[in-house]
C-alpha cells in the first residue's frame, strides 16, 4: 500500500510518514503477537503483525495517541470472497455472521494491537447507527453486480472529491497483503523450514480440536499452546471464506487464493 498511501497523502495534503518492516522484525514479533491476541487463527495473526509494528512505531516516534481505523467495512459491505455469494439472502446471512464474530477476528486484532501500544482507536464504520442502517439495506444492492466490490461504499464517496478516482475505484486487496505480499510468503516459508512432512503429520495429530492443516497453522498453534496450554477452545474456528459457496472451497484464508483476485493488491 506504500504507493497508494503516498497518492492519498499528496492528494489531501496530509503529513505522511512511512514505516518499513524487515523479515527479522516480522519473526521477532510473532510470539508477542500471538500471546497478545490469544489466538492461533491464521489470517488474524498475519494481519496483526503489520498493524502491531505500525502502532509500535506510532507510539515510539510520534505524540499521536488516537487513530482512525477502517475496521468493520468488510463485514458490512463485503470481502473479496463475498463476490461469490449466490444471492442477497446468502450475503446478508454471511454479513450477520461476520458482525457477530467481530470480537474474535478483525476487532480483536485492532483492539489488541492498538491498545498494547497505548493508543486509542476511533472506528467510524462501527458507529451503531451506521451499522444498523447498512444492515437494513436490501442485500441485493451489496452483491458485486457492478464489477467492483463494496460498490455502495465507493459510491458514497464519489461526490465531493474526497479521494482520487484511482484510489476510490482500486481493486480490493487482502489486508495482510497491503503490507507486502512477501510478508505472508515469508511466514509460510519460515513455517515450512521448521517441520519435515513427517513431523508436521505427527504433531498435527496431537490436536483433536481445530487441528492444524498447514505448517504455518501448526507453527501458530504450537506458539499459542506455550502461552495458553489446553485452551484451544478460546478460538471458535479458523476464519475462512464460506466453503459452501462455489469458488470459496480453499485451504488458505487469504483472498490471494481466490479465482477473482485478479489485479488486486498490485
Model regions and ranges:
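ATP-dependent adenylate-handling active sites, centered on carboxylate activation for C-N bond formation
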Residues: 1-161, 175-190, 201-203, 207-212, ...
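A short alpha-helix-loop-beta-strand transition element characteristic
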Residues: 164-171
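C-terminal catalytic/acceptor-binding lobe
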Residues: 193-194, 198
Amino acid at each position: 500500500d506504500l504507493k497508494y498511501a503516498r497518492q492519498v497523502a499528496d492528494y489531501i495534503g496530509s503529513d505522511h510518514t512511512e514505516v518499513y518492516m524487515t523479515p527479522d522484525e516480522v519473526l521477532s514479533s510473532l510470539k508477542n503477537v500471538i500471546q497478545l491476541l490469544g489466538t492461533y487463527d491464521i489470517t488474524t495473526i498475519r494481519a496483526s503483525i503489520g498493524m502491531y509494528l505500525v502502532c509500535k512505531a506510532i507510539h515510539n516516534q510520534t505524540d499521536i495517541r488516537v487513530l482512525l481505523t477502517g475496521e468493520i467495512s468488510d463485514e458490512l459491505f463485503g470481502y473479496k470472497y463475498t463476490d461469490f455469494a449466490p444471492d442477497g439472502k446468502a450475503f446478508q446471512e454471511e454479513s450477520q455472521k461476520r458482525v457477530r464474530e467481530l470480537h474474535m477476528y478483525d476487532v480483536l486484532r485492532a483492539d489488541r494491537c492498538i491498545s498494547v501500544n497505548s493508543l486509542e482507536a476511533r472506528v467510524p464504520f462501527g458507529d451503531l447507527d451506521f451499522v444498523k442502517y447498512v444492515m437494513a439495506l436490501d442485500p441485493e444492492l451489496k452483491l458485486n453486480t457492478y464489477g467492483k466490490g463494496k460498490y455502495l461504499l465507493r459510491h458514497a464517496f464519489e461526490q465531493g472529491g474526497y479521494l482520487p478516482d484511482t484510489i476510490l475505484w482500486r481493486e480490493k486487496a487482502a489486508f495482510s497483503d497491503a503490507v507486502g505480499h512477501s510478508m505472508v510468503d515469508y511466514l509460510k516459508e519460515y513455517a515450512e523450514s521448521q517441520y519435515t512432512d513427517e513431523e508436521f503429520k505427527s504433531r498435527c495429530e496431537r490436536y483433536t480440536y481445530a487441528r492444524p492443516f498447514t505448517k504455518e497453522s501448526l507453527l501458530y498453534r504450537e506458539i499459542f499452546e506455550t502461552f495458553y496450554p489446553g485452551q484451544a477452545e478460546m478460538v471458535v474456528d479458523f476464519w475462512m471464506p464460506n466453503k459452501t459457496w462455489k469458488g470459496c472451497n480453499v485451504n488458505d484464508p487469504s483472498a490471494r487464493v481466490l479465482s477473482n483476485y485478479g489485479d488486486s493488491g498490485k
